[in-house]
């Protein structure tokens, strides 16, 4: 990556730290997840959850959402100023599932936000521990990425639904900071920028006055984040053009959509981290594991290790397949929603099936669903191997971006070819004559045309046995190249 010197590792972003050495990073990430674990244990005590109920992923999600809502200052302020009927701005809650007489029952709980904030701070040595909150946001975002394909949202902003693999982090809240920006896909950033430009077109005052100045700063910052994700000079130059535009309008929207399409082959660098549900950290802390002393990393073996030894349950609807539910959560845990299925299957050690073939709905259960027939199952979150999470997008040879499959944003740093249908992608570029023609466009199209699907990305990188924690012995899987992607 260019400008490597100015980049902080994700762990530093995650923990808000300045430059630290590896040991310090591991310790501060460890401190962050043990704080989440302690908070979860305390909440289980408050709610008098049994061991089984505390391991239920739906309960974990409710508790995580409560603390995120308790710390959402902007929304809290908004709720205070715009009171809506039947919503107490000072309270937060959600469904908690309990086991009664051999059945699962739903109980809606309500807590003071102040109380939740107190418990969270107490679990985090009296600090606000924003990093831990961001971590939970990213876990929810990864779960959404695995569960939903944002086709409707893409069409709404004038993008192509086939670009769904660029949409990582599209449900992350704005307040997720640098760690959140690192995991957002190219499509997500493009969509945020297009929404902003459209508002500017419809609302004359959007860029004007004191507020408009702040808007402009936000616009340029988002442009810079997106620029930093691109790995070729031409794409970056085009981003400069979008950023410097006096009065962003349709020409900029066209340029951004062009750039998003180009990212299907000249892929952006998007960070991946394994963020696990709070109950997993809670279980580990409860069993006496000292995260801060041992250190922890979101991109190495640690999350795999943790999942090897954690038993997490999930509620299952009558016609859902428990194995498919497990796959969904496994993908969410490793931020692998857009990974090549061959790679995921190899690491997991069981076949990972395409999203469309899963007979399972989302993890959360709607409040109007009948609990009578709902059962629970153990989620199978273990893996056969582990691999390092990547932030590069798969272009190991820096000089020219290597090819990318239409539906892949690599998660694991594992050698593979990135098969893609060049014809399909290039078809998206013909017949689009609006927008500016520029040397940059010509250059980008030329690079895309010269990309070869058989090029190998992540040369020499492999997966590792779970006993190989120092990653000394890479096993490079060989995929037969015509396998499903």
Swiss-Prot record:
- Does the keyword Ribonucleoprotein belong to this entry? yes
Function of this protein?
Encapsidates the negative strand viral RNA, protecting it from nucleases. The encapsidated genomic RNA is termed the ribonucleoprotein (RNP) and serves as template for transcription and replication. The RNP needs to be localized in the host nucleus to start an infectious cycle, but is too large to diffuse through the nuclear pore complex. NP comprises at least 2 nuclear localization signals that are responsible for the active RNP import into the nucleus through cellular importin alpha/beta pathway.
User: SUPFAM superfamilies per the record?
Assistant: flu NP-like
- The record's account of how the chain is modified after translation: Late in virus-infected cells, may be cleaved from a 56-kDa protein to a 53-kDa protein by a cellular caspase. This cleavage might be a marker for the onset of apoptosis in infected cells or have a specific function in virus host interaction.
| Major place of residence | virion
Q: How does it assemble?
A: Homomultimerizes to form the nucleocapsid. May bind host exportin-1/XPO1. Binds to viral genomic RNA. Protein-RNA contacts are mediated by a combination of electrostatic interactions between positively charged residues and the phosphate backbone and planar interactions between aromatic side chains and bases.
Q: Name one GO biological process term.
A: viral penetration into host nucleus
Q: Does the keyword Cytoplasm apply?
A: no
> Which classification does the entry list for the species?
Viruses, Riboviria, Orthornavirae, Negarnaviricota, Polyploviricotina
Q: According to its record, what are the GO cellular component terms?
A: helical viral capsid; host cell; host cell nucleus; ribonucleoprotein complex; viral nucleocapsid
Q: Which domain of life is it from?
A: Viruses
| The protein's name in its UniProt record | Nucleoprotein
Intracellular or extracellular location(s): Virion; Host nucleus
Where is the stretch described as Disordered? 1-21
Motif Bipartite nuclear localization signal: list the residue ranges: 198-216
Q: Which Pfam families match?
A: Flu_NP
The entry sums up its family as follows: Belongs to the influenza viruses nucleoprotein family.
Q: What GO annotations for molecular function exist for this entry?
A: RNA binding; structural molecule activity
InterPro entries (alphabetical): Flu_NP
Keywords, ordered alphabetically: Capsid protein, Helical capsid protein, Host nucleus, Host-virus interaction, Ribonucleoprotein, RNA-binding, Viral nucleoprotein, Viral penetration into host nucleus, Virion, Virus entry into host cell
